[in-house]
Amino acid sequence: MKRLILPFLSVGLLLGTTAHAATPLKTEQDKLSYSMGVMTGKAFRKHDIKIDPQTFSMGLSDAYLGKETQMTEAEMRQTLQQFEKQSLQKMQHKMKQTAQQNAEKSRAFLTANKNKPGVKTLANGLQYKVLQAGQGQSPTLNDEVTVNYEGRLINGTVFDSSYKRGQPATFPLKSVIKGWQEALTRMKPGAIWEIYVPPQLAYGEQGAPGVIGPNEALIFKVNLISVKKK
């Protein structure tokens, strides 16, 4: 319950406005109160929380001024618990729908992509295209690699890029997603590949909240710069 409710209430605790005609914001307290009200309202809208603004203001005012509330603590707790339960069910349903939609889009993309010139497909579904060949010994899962890369969603949105940061990334090969492991252990230093990673070899049904949705196929341009043997 705290995850869904308290962030909004903590922002709005000083809000004392109701749905009246606009009044001038003369003092800093006026501006602060209004700003917190706007922030709280935006949070409710963002999370699709349906409230009655006047009743919300009444409850806020009663609590802030120390007045007797119109509901007991037990009644309010039960109401908020029921709200959280419904919100969680709604969120899970939406996630399931999104996962199904993304899975269909990913399958369609990979099915079309595998027939494009230069694209090769491995037995596990990973697809890749060699943009530049490399030389030397390929890394093993026990090695550390240094790479430059750009990650994109299938709609073209760039979600991560070492090129933009201006600095290559170095990491143990064991620490990255399966799709990267499969590709990099086949690459040689200096190679540049574009890899097309199905959801099960990327972030799966969980996704990476805020960045990558559930069941999203990903596209990476990867330049293997060097390998450090372990």
UniProtKB/Swiss-Prot annotation:
Superkingdom field: Bacteria
Lipid biosynthesis among keywords: no
Protein localization: Secreted
The entry's keywords: Isomerase, Rotamase, Secreted, Signal, Virulence
Keyword Isomerase applies: yes
E.C. no: 5.2.1.8
Biological role stated in the UniProt entry: May be an essential virulence factor associated with macrophage infectivity. Exhibits PPIase activity.
Family of this protein: Belongs to the FKBP-type PPIase family.
Name of protein: Peptidyl-prolyl cis-trans isomerase Mip
Gene name in the database record: mip
